[in-house]
Amino acid sequence: MSSTYSTNLGIELMGTGDQAGNWGATTNVNLGTLIEQAIAGYTTYSCSGGTDTLTMTNGASATARNMYIQLNGTGGGTVVVPGTSPNANTKLYFIFNNTSSAITVKVSGQTGVSVPAAAKIVLACNGTDIISAINYIPSATLPSPTLTGTPVEIGRAHV
């Protein structure tokens, strides 16, 4: 039986009886690299300002598998993440747009989400497109301002 790969993360699923004497190496890559990238991976990516495509290679370390991606380089472009074959890639992304212009994060052929310059955002790939993972933020309650000191009149000339 041949190995296959998981739908969302491209993790190798060894077939019964496969890789005699080598299963440990595959398991170590799956657990120590691929799953770790998916749930705690942090990487930086240098954007070109055009269309940049992040990949998720089956059974190997890949930028698009990381949970947190800091986008550096030239803003104003598009970052495309895998959304279809070989990986449906339904997963969360924490994105930090560390450029001076907005960047659109999307799946090829879709609209995606525009991430403003210097913004940090949580996005979700639903297998078809990138969407905002958060649609509710409770309102913040701010304390009333308190002014102290002596009042000063500004802008009035005394003759």
Regions found by a protein language model. Name each.
Residues F94, V122-A124:
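Residues within well-ordered beta-strands of beta-sheet-rich folds
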Residues A117-K120:
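Tight coil/turn sites that cap or link beta-strands
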Residues Q110-S114:
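Surface-exposed loop/edge segments in extracytoplasmic proteins
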Residues S2-I103, T146-R156:
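Exposed extracellular interaction/assembly regions and N-terminal maturation sites
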Residues D129, Y136-H158:
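Low-complexity, small-hydrophobic/phenylalanine-enriched stretches
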Residues M1-S2, V107, P138, P143:
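Intrinsically disordered, low-complexity segments enriched in Ser/Pro/Gly/Ala and basic residues
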Residues L31-A40, S101-G109, A124-Y136:
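Short, surface-exposed terminal/edge motifs of secreted or surface/virion proteins that either
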